[in-house]
Amino acid sequence: MSRITALLPAYNEETSIGSVVLCTRKYADRVIVIDDGSIDRTAEVAALAGAEVLRHPQNRGKGAALKTGFESL
C-alpha cells in the first residue's frame, strides 16, 4: 500500500492552517507544513493540528517552500 504525503506551503495563515491540516489528514498519511517566514502563529497552529512543521526564518516564496518540503522527503 502506498503512503501519501501532503506538502502545504504557508505564509501568515494562522486563521486557516489548522482546518486545512485537519482536512488534509483525512486523505494523507503525513502532512508537512512549510512555514515560509510567517510572523504569526502559523507554525504553532499547524503543529497543534497534527502536521510536521518545517520553518524558513524569512519569506522565500512558494517555490522555495515547496523545494524545502520535497528535500525533506
Regions found by a protein language model. Give the residues of each.
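Structured catalytic core of nucleotide-sugar glycosyltransferases
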Residues: 1-73
